[in-house]
Design a protein with these regions (language model features):
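Divalent-cation-assisted or electrostatically stabilized phosphate/pyrophosphate-binding catalytic cores
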Residues: 94-125, 174-190, 212, 216, ...
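Short alpha-helical scaffolding segments that buttress acidic/His motifs in well-ordered protein cores
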Residues: 35-36, 40, 70-76, 153-160, ...
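Conserved N-terminal diphosphate/IPP-binding helix and adjacent helical/loop segment
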Residues: 1-78, 82-83, 87-110, 114, ...
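Short glycine/serine- and small hydrophobic-enriched flexible loop segments
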Residues: 52-56, 81, 130-138, 198-202, ...
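Short hairpin/turn module used for nucleic-acid contact or packing/dimerization
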Residues: 288-343
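All-alpha helical catalytic cores of prenyl diphosphate-utilizing isoprenoid enzymes
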Residues: 24-25, 39-47, 122-130, 137-238
Length: 343
C-alpha cells in the first residue's frame, strides 16, 4: 500500500473511533463529531511523510507503528487548519464549508448562532490537537523512542501558536517582507517540514549533526511551501485549491506577496493598493485589479525567485548529509512536490 494510503487509513480509522466515543456521550454532539471526521478527509500528508523519512534516513526500517506516529503530525495540521479558518473567517477548505460554517446548522435555532458555531469549531480544533498527542503516544513504538521525541512537541506547539499570533498582530499593518517571512517561518514552515523531520529523527535516535541538517533542509523548504501557498491563494484556481482566493486580500494579511508588491510599488500604485486591501466584500473586479497591479510590478516573479532560492538551499543542505540513497531520493521528491504544485 502506498504511504499516503497507509496514513489515510490510520487517520480515518482512529478518528472515526474517537468521533464515535465522543458522539456517544450525547446525541447533540453528532455534528461536532462529524467535523472531527471531516477534518481528516483531505490532505497531501506531507507532514507525515517528512516524519517518516526523518526516521528512515537514520537507517530505521519501515514500521506500521512509525506510520501511526507520523500520522499524528497530520492531526496537528488538521487542528491548526480548523483554528486558522476560524481566525481568518474563511468560508471554504478543500471546496467544502469550513468547520465554523458547517456547524451553523447545528445551532441555527439558538441565539447568536454564528458565534455558537465558531465556539464549537474552536473546540473541534482543540480536540484534534489532543487526539494528535494520543495517536502519537499509542502508536506502538517503544516508550524510550517516544520519550526522545516528546520534548519536541512542546517546541512545535509553541512555535506554531507564536506564528499564528504574529499573523494576527501583523494583519492590517504596513507590509514588510522580513516580517512576513518570520510569520511564514513560525506559522507554517517549522511544523510542516522541520518539526516532523526532527520528531522522526528523534524517534530513530538521530545524532546532533543529522538533526542540524534536517533543520537546514527543512526551514527553507517550509518557507518555500508557504510562499507557493500564498501565490496559489491569489492566482490559483479555486476549483483546484479548494479555498476562496479573496481571503488574503480582503483580510489584508501579512503575506510576502503583498509585502513585495508594496516594496516595488510607487506612490500612485500604493494608493491603489491601499484602497483595495482589507475592503469587505471585494468584488471580482477589485481582485483582478490587485492581480493586475502585482503582475505589472512583477511581484509574483519575485516570489517565484524566493521559492527557487529556498528549494536550492534546501537541496544543497540535503546533499551535505550523505543520507542513504533511498532516503535522499524521497526527500528530494518531497521538496519538489511541496513547492511545485497547483493546490
Amino acid at each position: 500500500m502506498a504511504f499516503k494510503a497507509r496514513v489515510d487509513e490510520v487517520l480515518s480509522r482512529f478518528v472515526a473511533e474517537e468521533a464515535d466515543r465522543f458522539a456517544g456521550i450525547d446525541p447533540l454532539l453528532g455534528p461536532v463529531a462529524g467535523q472531527l471526521e471531516e477534518a481528516v478527509t483531505h490532505g497531501k500528508r506531507l507532514r507525515a511523510a517528512f516524519c517518516y523519512w526523518g526516521w528512515r534516513a537514520v537507517g530505521q526500517p519501515d514500521s506500521d507503528a512509525l506510520v501511526r506516529a507520523a500520522a499524528s503530525m497530520e492531526l496537528v495540521h488538521c487542528a491548526a487548519v480548523v483554528h486558522d479558518d476560524l481566525i481568518d473567517d474563511s468560508p471554504l477548505r478543500h471546496g467544502r464549508p469550513t468547520a465554523h460554517v458547517a456547524l451553523r446548522d447545528a445551532v441555527r435555532h439558538r441565539p447568536h448562532a454564528p458565534a455558537a458555531a465558531r465556539s464549537l469549531a474552536m473546540l473541534v480544533g482543540d480536540l484534534l490537537m489532543a487526539l494528535a498527542g494520543q495517536l502519537f503516544a499509542t502508536s506502538g513504538l517503544p516508550a524510550a523512542y517516544l520519550a526522545r521525541a516528546r520534548p519536541l512537541w512542546a517546541v512545535m506547539a509553541r512555535e506554531l501558536i507564536a506564528g499564528e499570533c504574529l499573523e494576527i498582530l501583523r494583519t492590517g499593518t504596513g507590509p514588510d517582507t522580513d516580517a512576513s517571512l518570520k510569520v511564514i517561518r513560525y506559522k507554517t514552515a517549522k511544523y510542516t517540514v522541520e518539526h516532523p523531520l526532527l520528531i522522526g529523527g528523534a524517534l530513530a535516535g538521530a545524532g546532533t549533526r543529522l538533526c542540524e541538517g534536517y533543520s537546514s533542509y527543512g526551514l527553507p523548504l517550509g518557507e518555500a511551501f508557504q510562499l507557493r501557498d500564498d501565490l496559489l491563494g491569489l492566482f490559483g484556481d479555486p476549483a483546484r485549491t479548494g479555498k476562496a482566493n479573496a481571503d488574503d486580500v480582503v483580510g489584508h494579511r501579512p503575506t510576502a506577496l503583498l509585502a513585495e508588491t508594496w516594496r516595488l510599488a510607487g506612490g500612485d500604485d500604493r494608493e491603489r493598493l491601499r484602497t483595495l486591501l482589507g475592503r469587505p466584500g471585494a468584488d471580482t473586479e477589485a481582485l483582478d485589479d490587485v492581480r493586475e497591479l502585482m503582475r505589472a510590478l512583477r511581484a509574483p516573479d519575485r516570489i517565484e525567485d524566493m521559492i527557487s532560492a529556498r528549494v536550492e538551499e534546501s537541496l544543497g543542505a540535503l546533499d551535505q548529509l550523505n543520507l542513504p540513497p533511498h532516503a535522499a531520493a524521497a526527500l528530494t521528491a518531497l521538496a519538489r512536490s511541496a513547492t511545485n504544485r497547483l493546490s
